Amino acid sequence: RFEYDNLRDGALLILWGFAKKLILAERLGTFVDQIYGNYTQYTGMLFFFVATAAFSIQIYADFSGCMDIATGTARLFGIRLAPNFLRPYFSKTMPEFWRRWHVTLGNWFKDYVFYPISISKFSLDLNKKARKRFGNEFGRIVSSAIPILAVWLLTGIWHGPDWKYV
């Protein structure tokens, strides 16, 4: 059934997504690529600090813009998708940042990569051996590092097959 609110909200979200992606992310990408691509021409840390800050905004605008376009398109058809970015740059801690960045992707990796690796026979055996060898606290850290590293690696690859993401 057609609802005007879905049409309006979906269209506005699509426009906002295109603005973030095409105006903000693309322009910042040109600047960032210029600095990082010709780093020998720039002296001083200020250029690299500004380029790194610009890259942070660029990557957020690019990913969240795409998600706004997808969410807006779904909304046109009356489908409400879960929010995917919950203002991550306003986080107070790194764990909070990662919970607010690409929420649905993080949940998927937690459910289908982190937990299965964590409860696998290999991980449980490693946990026992690490606790016996290094003590309870450090052994727990060693055995939990493998699923965390697997999630980070796969999340990086998902964002783009480039070392800057991995």
Sequence positions of predicted segments:
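Membrane-embedded transmembrane alpha-helical bundles that form the catalytic cores
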Residues: 1-166
